[in-house]
């Protein structure tokens, strides 16, 4: 066989994480995947991380205060925000940027007709890595637009972007949509919501667990604090745990259109009979409206085990890949295909610690504290619930937030105060507002 000169092989301009490169190890030539090569280079390189990433020290095991702070290259966080915001996305993936200060018009000044698509939040893939600081011993969540080892969150365009409903999901005919000026849909099972999302096309689904982790990352990056309600606003349910649902159910999406891609709140009055809400507001997380405190949201990409199933103990958390929901057989055992497993806390209570780990799992690990300490949110769980809900509703007041979770309900559960948020997992084509409206 003739020898081949590596220097004469075909040049390429890009590679995948799964591709391999040649390296010298102990005097011998070896192959290594690009992903493992990046991890090896970056392993333990704290100075590099401080240059290219911003970090949040996760101090849950050392303090009850919710103030964690932000370290590293905070200018990189400012830059990341510039690439994020609201777009109108058509069913086939054409996306036009809306004005960053007024979601009634596109960035080019063209008036928005929401019936031609869905109002979605789009942001670039975000790399993350959890690494224990060598000096303080505190785990730090490092985030960057650049590869830093660890993992990344990106569900659309081959993993290059995240595309999440800016508003809570509502119904237009048989389709789940993300539009302003309508009441969010409820009283449907997760399967019914997912099927309604699929009416838009096979690349449409519901917000998944990874995207909920991303929303948590955004909140921590902006405030360096786990108590999002105290920093941004308490949401529709306010700061006191009163039954405000009947009044909250009459509210409509799009209250934050005037806030565009910014962080902020709009104070509102919510009165349900003799119950008057305190500190009620509509909140906006750089274009994502009301991710907590109004209506629970179903999550795809995750389910829990049930002690009623012979193959499960009820402590399992299954996190699986793909824009799909589990089958009945999977719910009774484990997901098919690629998945990983974690262990859930099966007691309800205030969230003192999250699982964290290398995957930045945001399920509760330890219960304790109150609504102003540790993670400042409440979790509902047991050994039989398989559904995963996130964010809390207008019954729960200060118990709601970005760490507020529920895994205590059976799979076919439905309630008016439980809804969904649309997500898109396909390819995106970026166009101007004028061309999108003219099509």
Predicted regions located by residue number:
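Short, intrinsically disordered N-terminal pre-domain segments
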Residues: 1-18, 436-439
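Short hydrophobic/aromatic-rich beta-strand motifs
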Residues: 18-25, 287-289
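Short, flexible beta-strand-to-coil junctions
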Residues: 22-29, 57-62, 167-170
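Short, surface-exposed terminal/edge motifs of secreted or surface/virion proteins that either
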Residues: 23-43
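GGW-centered surface loops in extracellular recognition modules
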Residues: 45-122, 128-130, 439
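C-terminal, surface-exposed recognition/capping segments
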Residues: 54, 211-213, 234-258, 262, ...
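Short aromatic-cysteine micro-motif
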Residues: 110-117, 142-291, 295
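A short, polar/charged loop-to-alpha-helix boundary motif
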Residues: 305-322
């Amino acid at each position: 066989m003739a020898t081949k000169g590596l220097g004469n092989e075909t040049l390429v301009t890009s590679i995948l994480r799964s591709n391999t490169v040649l390296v010298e190890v102990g005097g011998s030539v070896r192959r290594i995947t690009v992903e493992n090569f990046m991890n090896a280079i970056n392993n333990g390189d704290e100075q590099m991380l401080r240059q290219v990433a911003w970090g949040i020290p996760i101090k849950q095991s050392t303090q009850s205060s919710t103030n964690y702070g932000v370290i590293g290259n905070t200018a990189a966080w400012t830059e990341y925000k510039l690439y994020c915001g609201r777009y109108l996305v058509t069913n086939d993936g054409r996306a036009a940027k809306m004005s960053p200060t007024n979601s009634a018009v596109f960035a080019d000044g063209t008036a928005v007709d929401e019936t031609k698509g869905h109002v979605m939040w789009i942001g670039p893939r975000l790399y993350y890595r959890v690494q224990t600081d060598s000096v303080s011993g505190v785990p730090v969540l490092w985030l960057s637009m650049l590869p830093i080892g660890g993992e990344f969150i990106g569900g659309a365009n081959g993993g290059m972007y995240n595309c999440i409903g800016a508003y809570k999901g509502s119904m237009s005919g048989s389709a789940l949509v993300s539009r302003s000026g309508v009441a969010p849909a409820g009283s449907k099972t997760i399967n019914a919501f997912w099927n309604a999302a699929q009416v838009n096309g096979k690349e449409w689904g519901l917000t998944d667990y990874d995207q909920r982790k991303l929303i948590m990352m955004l909140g921590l990056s902006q405030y360096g604090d786990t108590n999002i309600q105290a920093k941004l606003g308490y949401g529709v349910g306010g700061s006191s745990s009163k039954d405000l649902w009947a009044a909250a159910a009459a509210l409509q999406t799009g209250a934050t259109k005037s806030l565009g891609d910014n962080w902020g709140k709009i104070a509102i009055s919510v009165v349900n009979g003799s119950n008057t809400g305190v500190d009620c507001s509509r909140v906006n997380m750089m274009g994502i409206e009301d991710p907590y405190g109004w209506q629970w949201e179903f999550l795809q990409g995750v389910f829990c085990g049930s002690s009623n199933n012979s193959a499960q103990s009820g402590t399992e958390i299954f996190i699986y890949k793909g824009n799909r929901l589990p089958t009945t057989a999977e719910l009774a055992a484990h997901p098919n295909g690629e998945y990983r497993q974690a262990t859930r806390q099966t007691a309800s209570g205030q969230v003192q610690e999250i699982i964290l780990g290398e995957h930045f799992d945001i399920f509760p690990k330890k219960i304790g504290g109150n609504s102003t300490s540790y993670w400042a949110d409440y979790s509902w769980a047991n050994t039989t619930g398989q559904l995963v809900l996130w964010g809390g509703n207008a019954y729960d007041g200060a118990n709601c937030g970005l760490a507020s979770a529920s895994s205590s309900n059976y799979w076919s559960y439905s309630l008016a105060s439980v809804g969904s948020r649309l997500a898109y997992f396909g390819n995106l084509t970026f166009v101007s507002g004028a061309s999108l409206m003219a099509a």
